[in-house]
């Protein structure tokens, strides 16, 4: 990227063009690499160095008579933790989804953020199976006892990470690991389950760890993969929880969701202009 070693050469080209009127300097920007680790001293020092380098180039541009009109440097992490570098604009990315830049910084509520996206589906087939029943491809999950299973009609073709599969097979070559968390809205109240076996192209399966009839779980019940909850410990899974289950980050959980999943927009009429509303399917506006 652009480093201090290139400042003089860049200004030597920019200044004549600006004086000729063929170049108008509107903005100056850079991107912080490790602003999402405010508790790691070496990363804080690295961010401080980036900030000072940015300010140094601003001073050089001003001295050359071509000051930038708009400066923007702060990503979500810096927007939340470094108000002194907000300058004229900030660039919250994951913050627009209502999430902190990294779980190490806290939770959305730490910064008065509210997660803006909820991913829901309805249960497909619910059926009873015996103990030792293999679930999904590869039999990487065996039911430990007589139980019921339920299909969730979302898969990796929809952007559900295959790496969020759940393995539980004694003696298998696969390491036992929990799958992605799912909140099932039962007639007896919400319950938390996990992906059992491999995520398939169009679906994944839940082991309900009991009789569906006794648990009050039926085909068509609503399920929530993530939403504005407090986390899987409260049976309210978040995108951060799915990021951990899939060995990735919430950014990827959000941006991998495919267009096969219908979008519904809450409060759209309150926040969007008539021009933007016209771009949406009326049936998607709640």
What are these regions (language model features)?
Residues 130-286:
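C-terminal accessory subdomain/extension
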Residues 1-130:
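Active-site loop/helix belt of alpha/beta enzymes
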């Amino acid at each position: 990227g652009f480093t201090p070693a290139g400042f003089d050469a860049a200004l030597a080209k920019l200044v004549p063009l600006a004086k000729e009127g063929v170049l108008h300097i509107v903005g100056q920007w850079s991107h912080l690499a490790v602003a999402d680790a405010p508790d790691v001293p070496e990363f804080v020092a690295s961010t401080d160095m980036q900030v000072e380098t940015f300010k140094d180039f601003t001073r050089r541009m001003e001295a050359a008579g071509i000051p930038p009109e708009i400066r923007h440097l702060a990503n979500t992490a810096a927007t939340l933790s470094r108000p002194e570098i907000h300058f004229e604009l900030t660039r919250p990315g994951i913050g627009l989804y209502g999430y902190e830049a990294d779980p190490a910084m806290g939770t959305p509520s730490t910064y008065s953020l509210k997660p803006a996206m909820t991913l829901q589906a309805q249960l497909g087939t619910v059926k009873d199976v015996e103990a030792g029943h293999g679930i999904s491809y590869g039999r990487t999950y065996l039911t430990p006892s007589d139980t019921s299973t339920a299909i969730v009609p979302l898969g990796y073709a929809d952007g559900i990470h295959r790496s969020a599969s759940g393995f539980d097979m004694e003696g298998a070559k696969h390491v036992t690991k929990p799958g992605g968390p799912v909140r099932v809205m039962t007639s007896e109240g919400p319950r938390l389950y996990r992906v059992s076996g491999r995520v398939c192209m169009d679906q994944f399966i839940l082991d309900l760890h009991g009789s569906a009839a006794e648990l009050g779980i039926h085909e068509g019940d609503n399920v929530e993969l993530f939403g504005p909850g407090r986390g899987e410990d409260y049976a309210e899974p978040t995108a951060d929880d799915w990021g951990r289950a899939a060995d990735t980050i919430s950014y990827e959980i959000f941006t991998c969701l495919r267009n096969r999943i219908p979008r519904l927009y809450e409060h759209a009429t309150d926040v969007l202009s008539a021009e933007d509303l016209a771009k949406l399917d009326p049936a998607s506006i709640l």
